[in-house]
């Protein structure tokens, strides 16, 4: 046998990723195009219809004149702006290229082979991806029938191997939330070595007296981290800006494994301007308050079930009856240039998630669904 033949037998024919990597289902974002449609309304990714703050745009453009320079590796200006807006020490803050990066950093810092990370059945898909990417074992906890997260079930799923609990509050794609006394009850039941991750990406939209973001808990507890994003209410999804606050020990661990220049300079500048523009945020909240209520009422009047939402989206449930299913509604809406998010990958095959859009988009969706349910061909 030739030497090359022996080598082929001894080694794989190509580099192979470590076990488990190819078993990960890659994240698939919401659709953004509709073939053959002149005007498209993208309501699939929970982007704000009002766009970013004009001050953020100006800061982004100004920072773009120095693209030859490396950014500040510590994102100092952004952390200081967040600290000023939130009243917290910038040293307790870490910034990332979207909260996705921070979620992955958490998994890689605290979850190893054989370790368990808990997430809810209808939670953000990145939790499972991050856990598997770190070599860990995702533990999926079922939600209640009303799609509310089940604190008792989460507590019951904790074992000696549990290292992290990912909890989106509010949750995407359901729009449900946990009152903060329930979050505190969950935290009180955890061993001190289990890190509770509070993903508050949609927190700015919540208008409930019993809701809290988790900021105070993250500042006072050693095993809590609260994550936030600039992609939603701040309208900076294209720039990928996320941040988190936690104990000094947790922030130190994450900083040790993040990239040395993980935030680009225009993003740092735009984010710093955006978070200090409270008036723009209030306009976005007011728009969402108006149209979230209107859409929920109008869609319910069509005979559809809508899960009560505190976010900038609604989860619409369709019957299994042929001609009236979620998949058929999705195709019908797409033909009209109205792109919603199919959420079968979240375990909700009979539902569509709709972002609160402009007045025009919102009214068009309601009319289109009325036509669909009445049997119109297009």
UniProtKB/Swiss-Prot annotation:
The keyword Amino-acid biosynthesis applies. Residues 1-20 are annotated as: Disordered. It comes from the Bacteria. Its cofactor is pyridoxal 5'-phosphate. It holds the Pfam family Aminotran_1_2. The keyword tRNA-binding does not apply. It catalyses: L-histidinol phosphate + 2-oxoglutarate = 3-(imidazol-4-yl)-2-oxopropyl phosphate + L-glutamate. GO terms for biological process: L-histidine biosynthetic process. The modification N6-(pyridoxal phosphate)lysine is found at residue 232. Keywords: Amino-acid biosynthesis, Aminotransferase, Histidine biosynthesis, Pyridoxal phosphate, Transferase. Pathway: Amino-acid biosynthesis; L-histidine biosynthesis; L-histidine from 5-phospho-alpha-D-ribose 1-diphosphate: step 7/9. GO terms for molecular function: histidinol-phosphate transaminase activity; pyridoxal phosphate binding. Residues 7-17 have a biased composition (Basic and acidic residues). Belongs to the class-II pyridoxal-phosphate-dependent aminotransferase family. Histidinol-phosphate aminotransferase subfamily. This is Histidinol-phosphate aminotransferase. The gene is hisC.
